[in-house]
Amino acid sequence: MKAQELREKGVEELNTELLNLLREQFNLRMQGASGQLQQTHLLKQVRRNVARVKTLLTEKAGV
């Protein structure tokens, strides 16, 4: 997910995206804990995408 794509979204869409990413992160962590996760790089990607969305939400809030 590119930052430019995220910048085009509104606050509600970003909140929805954040919720989806956090759910995905939780599922990946559970798979990793149970030894079922084959693609460990996905954890890093999701973590960084969460950070991107949170950064944009902060920017849009004007804080």
Swiss-Prot record:
GO molecular function: structural constituent of ribosome
Cysteines paired by S-S bonds: none
Keyword annotations: Ribonucleoprotein, Ribosomal protein
Listed transmembrane segments: none
UniProt xrefs under InterPro entries: Ribosomal_protein_uL29 (IPR050063), Ribosomal_uL29 (IPR001854), Ribosomal_uL29_CS (IPR018254), Ribosomal_uL29_sf (IPR036049)
Pfam annotation, one family: Ribosomal_L29
GO biological process, one term: translation
Gene Ontology CC terms: cytosolic large ribosomal subunit
PANTHER family: 60S RIBOSOMAL PROTEIN L35/50S RIBOSOMAL PROTEIN L29, LARGE RIBOSOMAL SUBUNIT PROTEIN UL29C
Family, per entry: Belongs to the universal ribosomal protein uL29 family.
Official protein name in the record: Large ribosomal subunit protein uL29
Organism: Buchnera aphidicola subsp. Acyrthosiphon kondoi
Name of encoding gene: rpmC
